[in-house]
């Protein structure tokens, strides 16, 4: 079953399968299923066409998912960088944005280590 251009795993429960769509977490998935009247513990393979269609329609009408959600996130980060606020500067420099320490950690955000040559010792005579 495809929703918002994503193939959902057929062997998983509906709540978990919906989280494979970018922009839908567990809470949103539970809300969607509750509003469409589908039990959260039903497998995706057990859903009929009408139920799948109701899920698709609800997501299309009321939620920003996949490309739309990613684009919105990129725009908000770009806005922070254009304004020149502290968070924007941290994004621009590829450093942690939320106040984490950077002296020893933050390798994921900073990338691979850039080796800096140490001070050479003078040769003794």
From Swiss-Prot:
Signal peptide: none
InterPro entries per UniProt: Rbsml_uS13_C (IPR027437), Ribosomal_uS13 (IPR001892), Ribosomal_uS13-like_H2TH (IPR010979), Ribosomal_uS13_bac-type (IPR019980), Ribosomal_uS13_CS (IPR018269)
Keywords: Ribonucleoprotein, Ribosomal protein, RNA-binding, rRNA-binding, tRNA-binding
Stretch list, region Disordered: 91-125
Cellular component aspect of the GO annotation: cytosol; small ribosomal subunit
Gene encoding the protein: rpsM
Entry keyword Coiled coil: no
Family, as annotated: Belongs to the universal ribosomal protein uS13 family.
HAMAP family named in the record: Ribosomal_uS13 (MF_01315)
Compositionally biased region (Basic residues): 107-125
Protein name (database record): Small ribosomal subunit protein uS13
């Amino acid at each position: 079953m495809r929703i918002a251009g994503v193939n959902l795993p057929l062997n998983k429960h509906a709540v978990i399968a919906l989280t494979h769509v970018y922009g839908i977490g567990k809470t949103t998935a539970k809300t969607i299923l509750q509003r469409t009247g589908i039990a959260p513990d039903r497998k995706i393979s057990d859903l009929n066409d009408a139920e799948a269609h109701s899920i698709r329609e609800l997501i299309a009408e009321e939620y920003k998912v996949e490309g739309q959600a990613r684009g919105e996130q990129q725009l908000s980060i770009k806005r922070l960088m254009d304004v020149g606020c502290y968070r924007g500067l941290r994004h621009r420099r590829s450093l942690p944005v939320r106040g984490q320490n950077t002296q020893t950690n933050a390798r994921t955000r900073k990338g691979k280590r850039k080796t800096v040559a140490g001070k050479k010792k003078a040769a003794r005579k």
